[in-house]
């Protein structure tokens, strides 16, 4: 049925051109190295969690994305429209997981480092003051909205290019943030905190601010503006 509808909606030549484009050989995605040691975020996030989160969970998304893209490439080359369309959820889930975690690792920094000191000046500081009235208000609002996510997902501080403001947004599962430029992301999947904080999300959310990389947030905001 999907194949029949697709063929009716688009000329055959157009479909062949589109599928040929998708079948272009791509390099495999790889797990990015952490910019710090697994125990660098302790006591806020344990070394055990960081090791499992990075080497097992993130690696699974990378593997899933590579497998889905390989299947899509084959389906596209074969003109198998139904299979190509059916792969979209896997591409979204695993691709989102890879993107989200790659951003997440970089917006964290070692305990006690210069990067985790709450800024008192700069572009990010000024924007937070203007949009939230200060960092404590930002933390309170972002923690509340992230904790309220039903099931798994992500809490984001994103920059809205239309309004030129920082806004708090949540996304379900591994959906990437598309409506805003990601500035800070917080993983609220259980694998990010359960071994250490059990089911007490507020404790995890309060602790993670001790290792937020404000220098990375400053850099992302400057690039977004």
Curated annotation (Swiss-Prot):
Any one Gene Ontology cellular component term annotated for this protein: cytosol
Keywords: Antioxidant, Cytoplasm, Manganese, Metal-binding, Mitochondrion, Oxidoreductase, Transit peptide
Disruption outcome: Decreases cellular superoxide dismutase activity. Sensitive to thermal stress, and menadione (induces oxidative stress). Decreases virulence in a mouse model of infection.
GO biological process: removal of superoxide radicals; symbiont defense to host-produced reactive oxygen species
One Gene Ontology MF term: superoxide dismutase activity
Superkingdom of origin organism: Eukaryota
Transit peptide, from-to: 1-27
UniProt EC number: 1.15.1.1
Keyword Metal-binding among record annotations: yes
Free-text cofactor note: Binds 1 Mn(2+) ion per subunit.
Residues spanning the signal sequence: none
Pfam family, any one: Sod_Fe_C
Catalytic reaction list: 2 superoxide + 2 H(+) = H2O2 + O2
Cofactor: Mn(2+)
Record-listed Mn(2+) binding positions: 53, 101, 187, 191
Record's function text: Destroys radicals which are normally produced within the cells and which are toxic to biological systems.
Family per record: Belongs to the iron/manganese superoxide dismutase family.
Name under which the protein is recorded: Superoxide dismutase [Mn], mitochondrial
Organism, scientific name: Cryptococcus neoformans var. grubii serotype A (strain H99 / ATCC 208821 / CBS 10515 / FGSC 9487) (Filobasidiella neoformans var. grubii)
GN (gene name): SOD2
